[in-house]
Amino acid sequence: MLSIVILFLLIAENSSQNYTGNPVICMGHHAVANGTMVKTLADDQVEVVTAQELVESQNLPELCPSPLRLVDGQTCDIINGALGSPGCDHLNGAEWDVFIERPNAVDTCYPFDVPEYQSLRSILANNGKFEFIAEEFQWNTVKQNGKSGACKRANVDDFFNRLNWLVKSDGNAYPLQNLTKINNGDYARLYIWGVHHPSTSTEQTNLYKNNPGRVTVSTKTSQTSVVPDIGSRPLVRGQSGRVSFYWTIVEPGDLIVFNTIGNLIAPRGHYKLNNQKKSTILNTAIPIGSCVSKCHTDKGSLSTTKPFQNISRIAVGDCPRYVKQGSLKLATGMRNIPEKASRGLFGAIAGFIENGWQGLIDGWYGFRHQNAEGTGTAADLKSTQAAIDQINGKLNRLIEKTNDKYHQIEKEFEQVEGRIQDLENYVEDTKIDLWSYNAELLVALENQHTIDVTDSEMNKLFERVRRQLRENAEDKGNGCFEIFHKCDNNCIESIRNGTYDHDIYRDEAINNRFQIQGVKLTQGYKDIILWISFSISCFLLVALLLAFILWACQNGNIRCQICI
């Protein structure tokens, strides 16, 4: 934003020492050779002197680990990290503001699904920490710590280390298990448990004896009961069986009951939930660098103060809102009408009517004058500062109107939840369309106000001078006043700074205004007078000729015969 630090700096050159006409003072505004086009309510293309781009279109090619804490899942997604899959041990105890999931993350253990995948993913991401609290579970006459060849850890058969696979005992027994855990703490607990779906009935009886099995998990407010779905499936890491993982939140004072006759994948403890933490998740292949930024997208971090961005609709942290427009320019200067070089110093000089002054560099509004001492140009601080004060806070006000920071994660749903995914995408697309429209309308409103304000200040300056001069000068209709008294540079300065005393010059101005001067004929007046003179001469010549003919006819000197 232009900051005016020079008060009425006069750029003058006495190039017209021999000027003998009446002094002239004109008002105009700043202009540049090439302005910037902005959109207003009334016009899609209005040229202004200066404008500020509001849409960020450049991003860093990396993710910034400061000030937000980033945790790189590497080959593990957040759910595998919570289950304790092999290869995810680096996530034990991890704490984050943003959990970075990689597109190349893979499952490395027994094949599984999560019926409420998106909900569990969101809970884990928002919690911001893998704070696992191990517990003692007293299971009755069953074998614990089941392992699978699909789940290798250091080339040894293993399993998810946060879960306990219960199978029948060596004595071929799997009695009813009924175990209760009470939450006596002051925080909510997240229990993750599973149900194994064997591929055949033989596998079911070999592992659990009972066919069918059943798993029921209850709290005071909820109950989930699952019967295993026995059936052959495509082999994944050598297994045609599957595990379905479920989750239950136990609030302080509540309890959880595990009831099963087979197929339970039991928890080894719980995750501590932090309701105060507001963390999130981002799926991207962009590497983590060493920069600083509060905003991250799937295409890289943003470092900007602009209120909008069109880089990515997926953004986390303290981010500008995503809009579809590639550019939205906020006018920070007045309407630009470049000066016409052929007009000269005082040819149609009214900047707010016809054109601006490119030489007016110290302010937005100013004066030009011509008197016996020469010519000069000076900026006017008062009107300039008045306009700047009204415009200066526009960007801040615009940011305040959009201060609900944009935060949009990419939601992932299981394949069976495709309709939910479609609905989610439709809602997000609609929100973006609305925000894009609102942003464009908001900027257009602000631009219209800016142009109206700057035009108004130009008119105020003109009226201020007119009220000072009154009948001491004549408005020439082009932004200039012809002054009818002697006005040296000190007099001109008094007009500019508002200290001009009309009464001092009143008598002189009145005398000069009504003084009879010789007629100064311009080429246009000469033509009119010549035509009038010629017409009168012709009329008199014809009249004399007719009078002579009538006189001659009466005296018999001329004989007229009219034949029909």
Swiss-Prot record:
Q: Which InterPro entries match?
A: Capsid_hemagglutn, Hemagglutn_HA1_a/b_dom_sf, Hemagglutn_influenz_A, Hemagglutn_influenz_A/B
Q: Which ranges sit in the Extracellular compartment?
A: 17-527
Q: SUPFAM superfamilies, per this entry?
A: Influenza hemagglutinin (stalk), Viral protein domain
Which residues are modified by glycosylation?
Answer: 14, 18, 34, 178, 310, 497
UniProt topological domain (Cytoplasmic) ranges: 549-564
Q: Where is the lipid attached (S-palmitoyl cysteine)?
A: 553, 560, 563
GO biological process terms held by the UniProt record: clathrin-dependent endocytosis of virus by host cell; fusion of virus membrane with host endosome membrane; fusion of virus membrane with host plasma membrane; viral budding from plasma membrane; virion attachment to host cell
User: Which terms in the GO cellular component ontology are assigned?
Assistant: host cell plasma membrane; membrane; viral envelope; virion membrane
Q: Subcellular localization, per the record?
A: Virion membrane; Host apical cell membrane
Per the UniProt entry, the disulfide pairs are 26-480, 64-291, 76-88, 109-151, 295-319, 487-491
Coiled-coil spans in chain: none
Give the Gene Ontology MF terms in alphabetical order: host cell surface receptor binding
In terms of domain of life, where is this protein from?
Viruses
- Annotated signal peptide: 1-16
Q: How is it modified after translation?
A: Palmitoylated.
Q: Which residues cross the membrane?
A: 528-548
Q: What else is known?
A: Major glycoprotein, comprises over 80% of the envelope proteins present in virus particle. The extent of infection into host organism is determined by HA. Influenza viruses bud from the apical surface of polarized epithelial cells (e.g. bronchial epithelial cells) into lumen of lungs and are therefore usually pneumotropic. The reason is that HA is cleaved by tryptase clara which is restricted to lungs. However, HAs of H5 and H7 pantropic avian viruses subtypes can be cleaved by furin and subtilisin-type enzymes, allowing the virus to grow in other organs than lungs.
Protein task = Binds to sialic acid-containing receptors on the cell surface, bringing about the attachment of the virus particle to the cell. This attachment induces virion internalization of about two third of the virus particles through clathrin-dependent endocytosis and about one third through a clathrin- and caveolin-independent pathway. Plays a major role in the determination of host range restriction and virulence. Class I viral fusion protein. Binds to sialic acid-containing receptors on the cell surface, bringing about the attachment of the virus particle to the cell. This attachment induces virion internalization either through clathrin-dependent endocytosis or through clathrin- and caveolin-independent pathway. Plays a major role in the determination of host range restriction and virulence. Class I viral fusion protein. Responsible for penetration of the virus into the cell cytoplasm by mediating the fusion of the membrane of the endocytosed virus particle with the endosomal membrane.
* Annotated family: Belongs to the influenza viruses hemagglutinin family.
This one is known as: Hemagglutinin
